[in-house]
Amino acid sequence: MKKVKEAEKRNIKRKKRIRDRIGFGVADRPRVTVFKSNKYFYVQVIDDVAGHTLASVSTIEKDLKLNKNIDDIRKLGEVLAKKLKDKNINKLIFDRNGYKYHGLIASFATSLREAGIDV
């Protein structure tokens, strides 16, 4: 149990260190944050100053019918890019939320860049 608590503390410390480094999202350049569960992948675009979520997508949405694999995560990035372009948001701050920039996280960020969003 002690090892689990220490791992949780390390994860929280890593998240805080990353958030301190990237700064806050504002209306003209909001923060996009990702969360991976064992089954699903969630993404939110957040304006930290106003405290509002501007857009969100996830693999749990029934109309998308996506799984948690690299190809579907790329599609998820394209869907989010379309939502952001409809709201005239072209620049984002990418918050990887403590995860390594590899695999699903990297493919999601790449799909946003390919869709024309400056990350």
From Swiss-Prot:
What highest taxon heads this organism's lineage?
Bacteria
UniProt GO molecular function: 5S rRNA binding; structural constituent of ribosome
Give a yes or no for keyword Mitochondrion in this entry: no
Against InterPro entries, the record matches this protein to: Ribosomal_uL18_bac-type (IPR004389), Ribosomal_uL18_bac/euk (IPR005484)
This protein's UniProt keywords: Ribonucleoprotein, Ribosomal protein, RNA-binding, rRNA-binding
- GO terms, biological process: translation
Q: Which GO terms describe its cellular component?
A: cytosolic large ribosomal subunit
Q: Keyword check for Zinc, yes or no.
A: no
Cystine residue pairs: none
Among Pfam families, the record links this protein to: Ribosomal_L18p (PF00861)
Q: Which family does it belong to?
A: Belongs to the universal ribosomal protein uL18 family.
Q: Which HAMAP family match?
A: Ribosomal_uL18_B
Chain's role: This is one of the proteins that bind and probably mediate the attachment of the 5S RNA into the large ribosomal subunit, where it forms part of the central protuberance.
What does the subunit comment say? Part of the 50S ribosomal subunit; part of the 5S rRNA/L5/L18/L25 subcomplex. Contacts the 5S and 23S rRNAs.
Q: What is this protein called?
A: Large ribosomal subunit protein uL18
Source organism (scientific name): Borrelia turicatae (strain 91E135)
